[in-house]
From Swiss-Prot:
Main location class: cytoplasm
Protein name from the UniProt record: UvrABC system protein B
Record's function text: The UvrABC repair system catalyzes the recognition and processing of DNA lesions. A damage recognition complex composed of 2 UvrA and 2 UvrB subunits scans DNA for abnormalities. Upon binding of the UvrA(2)B(2) complex to a putative damaged site, the DNA wraps around one UvrB monomer. DNA wrap is dependent on ATP binding by UvrB and probably causes local melting of the DNA helix, facilitating insertion of UvrB beta-hairpin between the DNA strands. Then UvrB probes one DNA strand for the presence of a lesion.
Entry keyword annotation includes Signal: no
Gene Ontology molecular function, alphabetical: ATP binding; ATP hydrolysis activity; DNA binding; excinuclease ABC activity; helicase activity
Domain comment, as recorded: The beta-hairpin motif is involved in DNA binding.
Annotated ranges, domain Helicase C-terminal: 438-604
Organism, as annotated: Arthrobacter sp. (strain FB24)
Length: 693
């Protein structure tokens, strides 16, 4: 992107730092992927069996090709997990997280059958919004960037050109009028607030200006001497302690949707022209109610834009503000990447169809809004990318999946295989059994497994059958739980943890194939009605379900069926193919499969331990836990010089925030706060040991 060239991008190498080295199939997969990417192949598929370390292979691939990378995943939870893995593997590089910043989102819609208009309603997660800004900031200021994103990255975002044009460059010794800088900050949608200093605001104290950019947790202090910038510092917003001195810094706008006065006035003129044209069409069709409704709503929005520079739902006028022709694609995160970026699509069998489906789902809702006079036709240009537009914007692509779809297999010239697990574990043995007497057979298998302290997953086709089976097993003394759609997210995490710990032995569910579900204690997966063709018994679903038993040395899968369907045959053949390769490799290299030792802990455990430790430490400091003051999240960096009282207060505040984040299921934020609390407590203990607290 040409405008980004005026920013001095930091160029640092991608470097994987890990105690582990590539093992099993990983070295060969990394070498082949690297060769094919460097040879210019546009589409490459990595067929990686469950548990073979596809994420680590991706990190080593990025290290080899040294290119900015976008990793697309199917949902926010997996995006957070993957971002954390990459941060551990590439600690010196920028690993960013870009997902929808809505905790709750109800788009505006009109239901013609009942004449019901539903207003837009949403709640924005400020921490996720910061991470989105952090991603675009990183992409424009450095090359060593990995962005882990959901399909949110193909939805409209302000133009990178306007984002850069709205940026201000601060350089030590440069001439700059203080008042001009304040006006510039306001035009960038930062608010002056001398009392409540938080992200997205600035404050002024004489010749000193301080600002917290939208994408930062630390503040920037600019000290003037007349019309010259005398000093620039990065400082802690809570304690005011200077972290480091700076020579040059960029401050980007507080919103991705920035438009200068000239661009806004041109947009208003274009909106007025479209309104007049659309009213003519509606009136000619005798749609007088719709015409009046459109006139009132659009005129109100125009008045807001003229007076305030923005209006609610301004994104519906994005094509006019961007100056785009009707029907052309919106700008999105992909436009912030340099031309040579690499795209990695994780779990491509799910994510690729998801990308293609976004446009039609959005259009069906907006057509009603336009037809009934709630929006101008140009509102339909505020949309996700179409599939062909997405393809035009991406270059070389790596598809990752244990079960690649027909699309990606058709695009690539053969696939790269990653079948061998570093632990030597092999794919489970698949046994097909008749449906007659299946429940009694299942009960016998459960007793065999539980006697060896192993766990069992059972997957059924219907909610009714799952409930009846759970009741039947309970009646026969089996410790069993039922996982269904009514169980909330936090309880699901707890159920899986309790299964691993042995609180119960059997988990019954309808769709237990969830990609990324790690349960090493599970040695048997039983699939009831395996011969009933459909989504839950497709070859892809069956292979994913079989993978849930691949974490155990003695893993087995029992399919109960009276005939072998095409889906079953494909799933069994593929599993046996992988199993044969794995057994041959282990025999040749003298490898004895090792059980996967995955720590039984989740964020709820860690928070409880952290809380007990905090109470003990604060008691030793002569303090008691009080209510936190809800201060905005801050980093623990550079607090060595802070008094003990400040540290105690900060620990209390961050602990409150940690529990609030966990309660709202924001586990990534809770984990980060837990780590910051740990660092602060380490410093407080050192002060206590030295007799300063």
């Amino acid at each position: 992107m040409s405008l980004a060239q005026e920013i001095n991008r930091v160029v640092a190498p991608f470097e994987v730092i890990s105690e582990f080295k590539p093992a099993g199939d990983q070295p060969a997969a990394i070498a082949e992927l690297t060769e094919r990417i460097k040879n210019g192949e546009k589409d490459v598929v990595l067929l990686g069996a469950t548990g073979t370390g596809k994420s680590a292979t991706t990190a080593w691939l990025i290290e080899q090709v040294q290119r900015p990378t976008l990793v697309m995943v199917q949902n926010k939870t997996l995006a957070a997990q993957l971002a954390n893995e990459f941060r551990e593997l590439l600690p010196n590089n920028a690993v960013e997280y870009f997902v929808s910043y809505y905790d709750y989102y109800q788009p505006e819609a009109y239901v013609a059958q009942t004449d019901t208009f539903i207003e837009k309603d949403s709640s924005v997660n400020e921490e996720v919004e910061r991470l989105r800004h952090s991603a675009t900031n990183a992409l424009l200021t450095r090359r060593d960037v990995i962005v882990v994103a959901t399909v949110s990255c193909i939805y409209g975002l302000g133009t990178p050109e306007e984002y850069i044009a709205g940026m201000v460059t601060l350089r030590k010794g440069a001439e700059m009028n203080r008042d001009d800088l304040l006006r510039k900050f306001v035009s960038m949608q930062y608010a002056r607030n001398d009392m409540d200093f938080h992200r997205g605001t600035f404050r002024v104290r004489g010749d000193t200006v301080e600002i917290i950019p939208m994408y930062e947790e630390l503040a920037i202090r600019i000290e003037f001497f007349g019309d010259e910038i005398e000093n620039i510092h990065t400082l802690h917003p809570l304690t005011g302690e200077v972290i480091r001195d700076e020579e040059e810094m960029y401050v980007f706008p507080a919103s991705h949707y920035v438009a200068g006065p000239e661009r806004m006035s041109r947009a208003i003129k274009r909106i007025e022209d479209e309104l007049a044209e659309r009213l003519q069409v509606l009136e000619s069709q005798n749609k007088l109610v719709e015409a009046q409704r459109l006139r009132m709503r659009t005129t109100y929005d125009l008045e807001m834009m003229q007076q305030m520079g923005f209006c609610n739902g301004i994104e519906n006028y994005s094509s006019h503000i961007d100056g785009r022709a009707r029907g052309t694609a919106p700008h999105c995160l992909l436009d912030y990447f340099p031309d040579d970026f690499l795209l990695v699509i994780d779990e491509s069998h799910v994510t690729v169809p998801q990308i293609g489906a976004m446009y039609e789902g959005d259009m069906s809702r907006k057509r009603n809004l336009v037809d009934f006079g709630f929006r101008l036709p140009s509102a339909m240009d505020n949309r996700p990318l179409k599939w062909d537009e997405f393809q035009e914007r991406v270059g070389q692509t790596v598809y990752l999946s244990a079960t690649p779809g027909k699309y990606e297999l058709g695009k690539s010239d053969g696939f790269v295989q990653q079948i061998i697990r570093p632990t030597g574990l092999i794919d489970p043995e698949v046994v097909v059994k008749p449906t007659k007497g299946q429940i009694d057979d299942l009960l016998g298998e459960i007793k065999t497994r539980t006697a060896k302290n192993e766990r069992v997953l059972v997957t059924t086709l219907t909610k009714r059958m799952a409930e009846d089976l759970t009741d039947y097993l309970l009646g026969h003394g089996v410790k069993v739980e039922y996982l269904h759609s009514d169980v909330d997210t936090l309880r699901r995490v707890e159920l899986l943890r309790e299964l691993r710990m042995g609180v119960f032995d059997v988990l019954v569910g309808i769709n237990l194939l969830r990609e990324g579900l790690d349960l090493p204690e599970v040695s048997l997966v039983s699939i009831l009605d395996a011969d009933k063709e459909g989504f839950l018994r497709s070859s892809t679903s069956l292979i994913q379900t079989i993978g849930r038993a691949a974490r155990n040395v003695s893993g087995q899968v029992h399919m109960y069926a009276d005939r072998i369907t095409d889906s079953m045959a494909h799933a069994i053949d593929e599993t046996n193919r992988r199993r044969a390769i794995q057994v041959a490799y282990n025999t040749e290299h003298g490898i004895d499969p090792q059980p996967l030792r995955k720590k039984i802990a989740d964020i709820t455990d860690q928070l409880a331990k952290e809380d007990a430790d905090t109470r003990e430490l604060l008691a030793a400091s002569g303090k008691t836990r009080g209510k936190g003051k809800g201060a905005s999240t801050v980093r623990a960096d550079g607090l060595a010089a802070a008094p003990a009282e400040d540290l105690v207060g900060l620990i209390e505040q961050l602990t409150e925030q940690m529990h609030a984040a966990a309660g709202e299921l924001q586990f990534e934020l809770a984990a980060r706060l837990r780590d910051e609390v740990g660092e602060l407590k380490k410093e407080l203990r050192q002060m206590q040991a030295a007799g300063h607290a």
